[in-house]
């Protein structure tokens, strides 16, 4: 399924102010999540395999290029709040992104925001369709979700790309709404 037309550099018209804020919030997500509760990260999968056409296009590599894929779930107080899917081509993994090899359970922000060689492109956002790879991961943790809002950004080092996509699960939005209610009370 080609999902590339779901990603937009412009905010979706149906976004609330809070959703817009979080989907386009600059910088690393990890420290902001840590400020919201007891943060933990679980690596769901880290493997090599063919990239789908949309992912290959986003990385500017040939379709069916073998890629490195890392899927994680980020939890607050034990509750799944954000899922993420990061990928790059195997040649990039063996070159400019070699520090991702065996990366384990640490947040990618530890390397993405500490190297001056790493450049981040602007965010895109999407209302994920059921067939998107990140949606499949997200439905494992939020099977009743009516809508899955996500953002993604491409990071580059010397022309080699890493694509990082993050989906904010309903539990995340419930926490945000609760925090806003406390502020206005």
From Swiss-Prot:
Its EC number is 4.1.3.40. Substrate binds at residues 70, 108, 166. InterPro entries: Chorismate--pyruvate_lyase, Chorismate_lyase_/UTRA_dom_sf. Pathway: Cofactor biosynthesis; ubiquinone biosynthesis. Its main location: cytoplasm. Keywords: Cytoplasm, Lyase, Pyruvate, Ubiquinone biosynthesis. GO terms for molecular function: chorismate lyase activity. GO terms for cellular component: cytosol. The keyword NADP does not apply. One of its GO terms (biological process) is pyruvate biosynthetic process. SUPFAM superfamilies: Chorismate lyase-like. Belongs to the UbiC family. PANTHER family: CHORISMATE PYRUVATE-LYASE (PTHR38683:SF1). Removes the pyruvyl group from chorismate, with concomitant aromatization of the ring, to provide 4-hydroxybenzoate (4HB) for the ubiquinone pathway. This is Probable chorismate pyruvate-lyase 1. The gene is ubiC1.
């Amino acid at each position: 399924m080609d999902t590339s037309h779901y990603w937009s550099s412009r905010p979706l018209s149906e976004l609330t102010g809070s959703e817009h804020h979080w989907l386009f919030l600059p910088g690393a997500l990890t420290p902001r999540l840590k400020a919201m509760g007891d943060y933990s990260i679980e690596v769901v999968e880290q493997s090599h395999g063919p990239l789908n056409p949309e992912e290959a296009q986003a990385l500017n590599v040939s379709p069916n290029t073998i890629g490195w894929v890392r899927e994680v779930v980020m939890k607050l107080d034990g509750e799944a709040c954000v899922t993420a899917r990061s990928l790059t081509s195997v040649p990039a993994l063996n070159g400019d992104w070699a520090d991702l090899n065996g990366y384990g359970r640490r947040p990618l922000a530890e390397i993405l925001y500490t190297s001056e060689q790493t450049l981040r492109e602007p965010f895109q956002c999407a209302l994920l369709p059921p067939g998107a790879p990140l949606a499949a991961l997200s439905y494992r943790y939020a099977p009743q979700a009516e809508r899955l809002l996500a953002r993604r950004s491409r990071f580059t080092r010397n022309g080699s790309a890493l694509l990082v996509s993050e989906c904010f699960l309903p539990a995340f939005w419930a926490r945000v709404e609760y925090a806003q209610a406390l502020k206005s009370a």
